[in-house]
């Protein structure tokens, strides 16, 4: 999401400020991937000690008419519009392929994409896994996005690892496979 927003901001000549309460020491020393690409597109990053949900509430009350606040992970109802388009494209593709059944998997941070995709594609099964937090966290996020809908993606529990921080066990396995 960060990189996509940085591209849109650059294209539209908008200012893009990214608030976070943590940046791994690895990313601070050597920004790479989406972070480096977003910074290169002009994204400003602000490290804050304030909890992000409290900061978002404060920022939301002081927004000017030409400003937009996007929650971490896009966890807000406006995200459903884009997912409706994605669902239509998936539905069209499935019809072209003559698929009556389809299982869709996507990893989740806040679970927003998986939730709205399952809501839009009730005829298919959407699977997700918790990349941060727990399966219970994802269910809480789903409830916050739409308290009236109980159509949730199927959550496949997962161990999670801190973003941009190498996990020694996985890195060792990667090295062994690379040799």
Where are these regions (language model features)?
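Catalytic phosphate/metal-binding cores of nucleic-acid and nucleotide-processing enzymes, i.e., regions
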Residues: 1, 12, 84-89, 93-99, ...
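Active-site-proximal loop->helix
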Residues: 3-50, 119, 136-149
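Short glycine/serine/threonine-rich phosphate/pyrophosphate-binding segments
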Residues: 1-5, 109-117
């Amino acid at each position: 999401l960060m990189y996509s927003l940085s591209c849109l901001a650059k294209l539209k000549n908008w200012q893009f400020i990214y608030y976070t309460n943590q940046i791994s020491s690895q990313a601070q020393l050597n920004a790479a991937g989406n972070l480096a690409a977003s910074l290169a597109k002009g994204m400003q990053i602000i490290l804050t000690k304030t909890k992000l949900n409290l900061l978002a509430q404060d920022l939301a009350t002081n927004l000017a008419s030409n400003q937009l606040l996007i929650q971490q992970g896009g966890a807000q109802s406006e995200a459903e519009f884009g997912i409706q388009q994605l669902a239509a494209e998936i539905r069209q593709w499935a019809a072209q392929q003559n698929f009556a059944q389809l299982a869709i998997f996507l990893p989740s941070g806040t679970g927003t994409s998986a939730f709205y995709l399952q809501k839009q594609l009730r005829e298919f099964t959407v699977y997700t896994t918790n990349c941060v937090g727990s399966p219970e966290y994802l269910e809480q996020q789903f409830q916050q996005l739409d308290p009236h809908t109980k159509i949730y993606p199927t959550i496949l529990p997962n161990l999670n690892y801190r973003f941009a921080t190498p996990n020694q066990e996985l890195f060792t396995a990667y090295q062994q496979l690379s040799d």
